[in-house]
Amino acid sequence: MAKQQTGLINRSYIATFLLFLVVLLPPCTKGKEGPSASVPTDCQQFLDKYFDAWKSKDIATLQALSFYLSPQDQSRFPAGSLELWRASKNNLVTENVEHVTRDFGDFKGYEVLRAKTTTISPQDQVAANTIGSGIHTELVCKARFSKKHDAHVGLHLIKETEGSQYIVAAWNFQAAP
């Protein structure tokens, strides 16, 4: 009979422990996206500058940091149309900042969730002609805003050479799941 009681006592301890794991631990980890991804120092500096511009609503800086156009693409523009492209790009940046601010509120901060860097050489003509040669970094950041507290920001950054500066080639915002 003593062995039966010990078995029952052990089972109740095990059941209590499993109940603790199943019921109490999931709420403790809910909402965690995992640790921040690491990015190269120059990429982190770019992100800080980019998101500081969002925080201060510095449209001119955001315009300067946005929309990559390769030298090959620039050379294909007819005379005078490159300035039209820049004006159109700058208007789009302004509209996007206004739209995101209206929908999400003021920017509060960010963290990098995922980052992937790929180098595309000029010799890889298909890729280089499609998205440009250089160092491409794709990021997903979790941004915090005043209205809808979290949004995921997808950024595709490019820099033409190791020593050049990053620029935003493409981006999108969406409410975090």
Language-model region placement:
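Ala/Thr-enriched low-complexity intrinsically disordered regions
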Residues: 6, 15-16
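Short solvent-exposed beta->alpha transition segments
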Residues: 63-136
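N-terminal secretory signal peptides that target proteins for export/translocation
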Residues: 1-9
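Short, low-complexity N-terminal intrinsically disordered segments enriched in polar/charged residues
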Residues: 28-59, 68-76
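Exposed beta-sheet edge and beta->alpha loop/turn motif
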Residues: 104-177
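Bacterial N-terminal signal peptides
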Residues: 16-24
